[in-house]
């Protein structure tokens, strides 16, 4: 998959465009720490920002050094550590992704993990 990665000043984040038509903006704001339930509630009615999917976070993790360099160059905050995804594993667990390697695992939804907002949409 070919990617275009650049800073988007309108969203204060990194804009990733894929050759499959996915457009993903990663917030340059710091990651928050909260439970999965709190993260889902926090982004529930947000029209722009959302909790990323496992696929989105693994795409970001695959190019994390380049993405973090762009974030740093524009005064934003690097992405590190384990981040919640919007994807549930089962009734009690949800998926989270290690941004320093791309590994995904499930963990209890009541546990606190990092959360970084994305804005995702399909261009075509």
Where are these regions (language model features)?
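Extracellular adhesion/carbohydrate-recognition regions
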Residues: 1-49, 81, 85, 93-96, ...
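C-terminal, surface-exposed recognition/capping segments
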Residues: 54-124
């Amino acid at each position: 998959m070919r990617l275009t990665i650049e800073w988007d000043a309108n969203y204060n984040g990194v804009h990733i465009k894929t050759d499959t038509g996915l457009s993903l903006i990663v917030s340059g704001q710091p990651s928050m720490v909260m439970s999965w339930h709190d993260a889902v509630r926090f982004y529930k009615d947000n029209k722009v920002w959302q909790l990323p999917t496992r696929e989105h976070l693994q795409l970001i993790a695959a190019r994390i050094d380049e993405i973090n360099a762009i974030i740093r160059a524009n005064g934003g905050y690097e992405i590190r550590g384990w981040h919640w995804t919007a994807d549930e594993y089962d009734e009690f667990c949800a998926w989270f992704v290690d941004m320093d390697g791309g590994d995904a695992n499930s963990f209890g939804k009541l546990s606190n993990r990092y959360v970084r907002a994305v804005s995702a949409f399909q261009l075509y």
